[in-house]
C-alpha cells in the first residue's frame, strides 16, 4: 500500500539515550580533526610547510585506529551495541584527556590513534543500538537520525573549535572533554535499563 512509514522523532525515549550517549565523541572528532594542524605546529614547534605532512600522518593515525577496530578487532570481539558504545566512550574520554595534555608529537599521535579506536567502537555500537531500538517499519526513520547525529555535530564543531582555539588553545579540548564526559556518563547510566532486543520486536 501507499501508507507512509511512521516518523521517528529525536525525542523518542527509545532513541534519545543512544543519541545522548554518542554525540560527545562526534563533536570531539570534529575538534580534533579541525585543530590538528594547529596542534602539530604549536606542540611540535614546526613551521607551516613541514607541518602539513605531519598533520596528514596524524589524521591517518586517527583513521587507522577506526578502521582497525571496525574491520578487524570489533567483529572478533562479539560485543553487543551497549558494550561497544560504553567501551568506546570510556576510551574516548581517556584518549581525549591525553591529547589535551600531550606535550610531544608522539603523544599526540598515540592519543589521536586511540581516539580513532574509540570511534571505531562507539559509532557502530550507537548505529546498531539505535537501529535495534525501533521496529522494522521505523528503520528508514532511524537511519536518517543516525546519519544526522554526526552531521549536526560536524556543522558546529569545526567553527566553534577554530574560534575557541584562537582564543585559548586548550578551550576547544576542554569543551570536547565536557561533552565526551557527559556522553560517557549517559552510556553507563541511561542505557542501563534499555532492553534492546525487546524494543526491536515491538
PLM regions and their residue ranges:
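Juxtamembrane intracellular "pre-TM" segments in multi-pass secondary transporters
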Residues: 1-21, 202
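Pair of pore-lining "gating" transmembrane helices in MFS-fold secondary transporters
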Residues: 12-32, 113-114
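Short amphipathic helix-loop junctions that connect adjacent transmembrane helices
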Residues: 34-54
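Loop-to-transmembrane helix entry/capping segments in MFS-fold secondary transporters
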Residues: 52, 134-146
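Helix-to-loop junctions at the C-terminal end of transmembrane segments
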Residues: 68-81, 165
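Structural signature of the two symmetry-related core transmembrane helices
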Residues: 83-98
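Intracellular juxtamembrane helix-capping segments at the cytosolic ends
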Residues: 121-134
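Symmetry-related core transmembrane helices of the 12-TM Major Facilitator Superfamily/SLC fold
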Residues: 172-189
Amino acid at each position: 500500500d501507499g501508507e507512509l512509514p511512521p516518523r521517528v522523532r529525536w525525542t523518542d525515549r527509545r532513541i534519545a539515550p543512544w543519541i545522548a550517549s554518542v554525540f560527545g565523541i562526534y563533536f570531539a572528532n570534529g575538534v580534533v580533526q579541525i585543530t590538528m594542524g594547529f596542534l602539530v605546529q604549536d606542540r611540535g614547534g614546526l613551521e607551516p610547510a613541514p607541518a602539513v605532512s605531519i598533520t596528514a600522518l596524524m589524521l591517518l593515525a586517527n583513521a587507522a585506529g577506526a578502521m582497525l577496530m571496525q574491520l578487524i578487532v570489533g567483529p572478533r570481539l562479539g560485543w553487543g551495541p551497549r558494550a561497544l558504545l560504553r567501551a568506546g566512550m570510556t576510551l574516548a574520554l581517556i584518549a581525549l584527556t591525553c591529547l589535551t595534555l600531550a606535550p610531544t608529537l608522539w603523544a599526540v599521535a598515540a592519543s589521536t590513534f586511540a581516539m580513532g579506536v574509540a570511534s571505531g567502537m562507539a559509532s557502530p555500537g550507537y548505529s546498531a543500538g539505535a537501529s535495534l531500538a525501533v521496529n522494522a517499519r521505523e528503520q528508514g526513520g532511524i537511519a536518517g537520525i543516525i546519519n544526522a547525529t554526526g552531521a549536526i555535530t560536524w556543522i558546529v564543531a569545526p567553527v566553534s573549535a577554530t574560534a575557541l582555539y584562537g582564543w585559548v588553545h586548550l578551550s576547544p579540548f576542554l569543551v570536547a572533554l565536557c561533552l565526551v564526559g557527559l556522553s560517557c556518563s549517559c552510556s553507563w547510566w541511561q542505557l542501563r535499563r534499555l532492553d534492546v532486543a525487546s524494543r526491536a520486536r515491538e
